[in-house]
Amino acid sequence: MRVQVPPRVQIQNEKQNENEACSSEFSSFFTLTLFNFDSIKMKFEFQNLSVYKKAKIFHQSTKSIVNEKSLKNYEKDQLSRTSFSIVLNIAEGSGRFSKSDRRNFFVITRSSVFECVSILDVLKDNNIISQEEFESLENQADELSRILYAMIKNLSEA
């Protein structure tokens, strides 16, 4: 005895089989893609950039001032956020696909370096940091600024 299956159920079964096939194909592709990335052992490229490493050192240096000196809360906040944004914008800019996007992030990053120097200059004028501390940080910032300028210029060329 043969049971008659209503047409709507047949369509649902066909769609389910089609979805399972697509799902299986996607799973195979996804597994293959993961396997390929695992075999390459990719690292985030920005972590290899000397400017990123130097920015982290600069951020740590400014962080020690924030932690060791008696700054007003707004000074602590502004210096911490600005020096941290240097590190973050280098990373984020490096992840952009177009040259103009990367360039814009590095321009913003360089502006943050300038902002940090101005904060440090005010702290020096208010005798919160010494001339030696200021010069040390200013030298680090100058190096960051020069590297970023070269990166910006390179990305600006056709």
PLM feature segments, named:
Residues 3-158:
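Amphipathic alpha-helical assembly/interaction segments
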